[in-house]
Amino acid sequence: MPHKIEGFFLLLLFGYEATLGLSSTEDEGEDPWYQKACKCDCQVGANALWSAGATSLDCIPECPYHKPLGFESGEVTPDQITCSNPEQYVGWYSSWTANKARLNSQGFGCAWLSKYQDSSQWLQIDLKEIKVISGILTQGRCDIDEWVTKYSVQYRTDERLNWIYYKDQTGNNRVFYGNSDRSSTVQNLLRPPIISRFIRLIPLGWHVRIAIRMELLECASKCA
């Protein structure tokens, strides 16, 4: 029964047309996940998109369209975005909390700034329900040259479960390369995408200080 419910969820998810498409800037010929992903006929239904116990899509129409989840628009609410050591964000740091990690945010307090600069820090998003996440957009701090240069991604479907690292084609934890300046938007597509409720970004490298503005992309299909 649970698998039937999950299959029905995916059928609904892929049954609508994307209202906003963001083209990939990646070279598909060089992306190892592109070589592994299979191209499904959209008419085959949800069963071809779901395998029991999977936490990523094994067969998908390659997410030709990507819908912003809502960091920039505000659809993602403040309580959905948290970070490591939240009790330490007092005084000046109270203006740079996890909720400020929103793409294209401007002005004072325009990003999440980690109070500590080490690889044990994280930024977490609770999607409130299981969604298909197909990409990540990042920027640095808007007013000063501070940004994240590389990061890893973890996910889980339930807060009672252990975190799972997103892997590369060799089975190692994938390292995503981030920003090289404070204003450019860097897009990393997830091939295959992640089916999950909770997502974590773990900074692995940074310029001066860990600073993030971001957006998640939700997978959408052009198939009606």
From Swiss-Prot:
Domain F5/8 type C: 63-219
Domain of life: Eukaryota
Stored PROSITE patterns: FA58C_1 (PS01285), FA58C_3 (PS50022)
Quaternary structure annotation from Swiss-Prot or TrEMBL: Homooctamer of 4 homodimers; disulfide-linked. The homooctamer has a flat, cogwheel structure with a diameter of about 14 nm. Two stacked octamers can assemble to form a hexadecamer.
Major location category of this protein: secreted
Disulphide connectivity of cysteines: 63-219, 110-142
Record Pfam families: F5_F8_type_C
Range of residues in the leader sequence: 1-23
Any one Gene Ontology cellular component term annotated for this protein: neuron to neuron synapse
UniProt membrane topology term: Peripheral membrane protein
Disruption phenotype: No visible phenotype at birth. After two months, mutant males display a profound disorganization of the inner and outer nuclear layer of the retina, with increased extracellular spaces in the region of photoreceptor ribbon synapses and the appearance of gaps, and a decrease in the number of photoreceptor cell outer segments. The number of cone photoreceptors is reduced threefold. After three months, mutant males display a layer of small, cyst-like structures in the inner retina.
Keywords: Cell adhesion, Cell membrane, Disulfide bond, Lipid-binding, Membrane, Secreted, Sensory transduction, Signal, Vision
InterPro entries in UniProt: FA58C (IPR000421), Galactose-bd-like_sf (IPR008979), Neuropilin_MCO_CoagFactor (IPR050633)
Single GO MF descriptor: phosphatidylinositol-3,4,5-trisphosphate binding
CDD domains, per database record: FA58C
Function: Binds negatively charged membrane lipids, such as phosphatidylserine and phosphoinositides. May play a role in cell-cell adhesion processes in the retina, via homomeric interaction between octamers present on the surface of two neighboring cells. Required for normal structure and function of the retina.
SMART domains per record: FA58C
Tissues expressing the protein: Detected in the eye cup. Detected in retina, in the inner segment of the photoreceptors, the inner nuclear layer, the inner plexiform layer and the ganglion cell layer (at protein level). Restricted to the retina. At the mRNA level, detected only within the photoreceptor cell layer, most prominently within the inner segments of the photoreceptors. Undetectable in the inner plexiform layers and the inner nuclear layer.
GO term, biological process aspect, one: visual perception
Protein name as annotated: Retinoschisin
Record localization: Secreted; Cell membrane
